[in-house]
Amino acid sequence: MCTSKLEEITGEWPPPALQAASTTSSSEPCRRLSPPSSKRPAGRTKFHETRHPVFRGVRRRGRAGRWVCEVRVPGRRGCRLWLGTFDAADAAARAHDAAMLALRGRAAACLNFADSAWLLAVPPPATLRCAADVQRAVARALEDFEQRESSSSVFPLAIDVVAEDAMSATSEPSAASDDDAVTSSSSTTDADEEASPFELDVVSDMGWSLYYASLAEGLLMEPPASGASSDDDDDAIVDSSDIADVSLWSY
């Protein structure tokens, strides 16, 4: 109806202008230029990423460097579960793991740490009835985990302190025994010096001049006369000694 009426009005369809436009468009490539727009583009002009690059359910809060944990409740569209603010990103990641274990169970939970499945004591999802129960279970599991971590970090330090005390206790008796040995050796040395029959203090008392004078007098003294013996061997020895004495004392 409309085309017939237009044909009756114009007598031709499509109009000549549209025909010319169609012929030019078929011969030349189509070029579309968007008109300049004075409106600002929709959306945020400045975007600051606050999500953690590695951990799930963790994002930064403020410029103080603190981290928050918030997870989505499965089966409820738009429902989120707030788990708190933490000083470290790994603590917030542990809170996320505890919440996933409480909401989905150990088999279906997507965890940040693989050891969270056995390190976090979280009750099964069937025992939790509401979001408040999940939050309390997560807080209790994180508290138990932090206590175990702190006790395990303090226990090696206590072992080191006990070992150092034992070493010091063993070194003190050895030092005392060394002192006793030195004292006993010094006392034995003093006793030996007191019991020694040769003392140079006599020489110092006499004086070196008297010592040499007595030595010279001993050299000037005549040897004692040798007695005769009935044995031939003794006579031979006496004769040889007499010869030696004559040669020695002939001066």
Swiss-Prot record:
Residues 54-114 bind DNA. InterPro entries: AP2/ERF_dom (IPR001471), AP2/ERF_dom_sf (IPR036955), DNA-bd_dom_sf (IPR016177), DRE1A-I (IPR045277). Residues 1-50, 169-198 are annotated as: Disordered. It comes from the Eukaryota. The keyword Transcription regulation applies. The keyword Transcription applies. GO terms for molecular function: DNA binding; DNA-binding transcription factor activity. It holds the Pfam family AP2. GO terms for cellular component: nucleus. Gene3D superfamilies: AP2/ERF domain. It is found in: Nucleus. Keywords: Activator, DNA-binding, Nucleus, Stress response, Transcription, Transcription regulation. PROSITE patterns: AP2_ERF. Transmembrane segments: none annotated. Belongs to the AP2/ERF transcription factor family. ERF subfamily. Transcriptional activator that binds specifically to the DNA sequence 5'-[AG]CCGAC-3'. Binding to the C-repeat/DRE element mediates high salinity- and dehydration-inducible transcription. This is Dehydration-responsive element-binding protein 1I. It comes from Oryza sativa subsp. japonica (Rice).
